[in-house]
Amino acid sequence: MKPKKIFSALLLSLALVLPVKAEVITIEPLFEYPVSPEEIVTLSDKSNWLMQHFWDNMDFKKKGAVNQSALNDAFKVYSLPMQWAEKAEVDKSVASLLDKIQKNPTLLLQFTKAAESSLYSERADIWIDEVYLKFLDAFLKNKKIPEIRKRRYERQMRQISNSLNGSIAPSFDFTTPTGTPGKFQPIGVFTIIEFGDPDCDDCRHAKLRMETDVRFSSLVERGLVNVLFILPDPVDGWQTKMTDYPANWVTGASDTVSDILDLRLTPSFYVIGKDGKIMEKNVSVDQAMKIAFKETSSDK
């Protein structure tokens, strides 16, 4: 679960107690959003209650499609408390919801789109891969949904499944600017991979941030941190744009890595521990460097 925005205590309370009034809604809601009882005090308990009761007022017996924008809004309100609710309550809530919609392929598709918008897309307030995977799994297993509609989601499921925090980072092939074939594999050294484009302003800023930080550069020079810059899906002439990268970085391009890993941002940073497991993904360069400092603090 990765929160992308910091909410104040006041906004949190408003989002949980008065979810309808917390936002300006220009569409008609599908149903009246529930309000947690006043006697429930803690943020966790309020969130648990909403997981249990959020969809109580929705009519799941209708066979036709619903307004997608309205469903997206409802799902966004539903998903925000997931970051404070107990995992067991979230899992139970999602399982119950999927059970209600699994026999209605139209509604299942719409809910999958809503989950994508609120839990996976770049504009989502939070990313919760484990929950989004549950919707993808149900959607892809539904035999009533045409295969052509599943292709994009099949790719997402493969990328996310390969990239879960705590899992071993998968290997991938790349080519260096000099044409030498390379292969990334976890090597027992703390590693930061920036998947980006030399022409991308944010990517250049991240590169500059790492190479000009004296403390971070020292870790790289001493072999305590391994840094890779990989260009996904390269076009002709990419080699000429990667001539000014630090010599102790591994640089290259890969035309297959975007099919293997979840690279929903540009740049996408992956932080990989000494044990080869993904510690964080799609974080900022500052977050990646902060983890590097923490993980190497005991190394001399």
What residue spans do the PLM features occupy?
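Positively charged n-region of N-terminal signal peptides that target proteins for export
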Residues: 1-5
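Non-catalytic, surface beta->alpha helical segment in thiol-disulfide oxidoreductase systems
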Residues: 265-300
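Short, internal strand/loop/helix patches
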Residues: 242-275
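Bacterial N-terminal signal peptides
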Residues: 8-17
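Thiol-based oxidoreductase modules, predominantly thioredoxin-like and allied folds used
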Residues: 221-237, 246-256
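Structural alpha/beta surface segment adjacent to cysteine/selenocysteine redox centers
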Residues: 57-81, 188, 235-247, 261-264
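Oxidative protein folding and maturation machinery
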Residues: 22-182
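Short active-site neighborhood of thiol/selenol oxidoreductases, capturing the structured segment around
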Residues: 182-212, 226-228
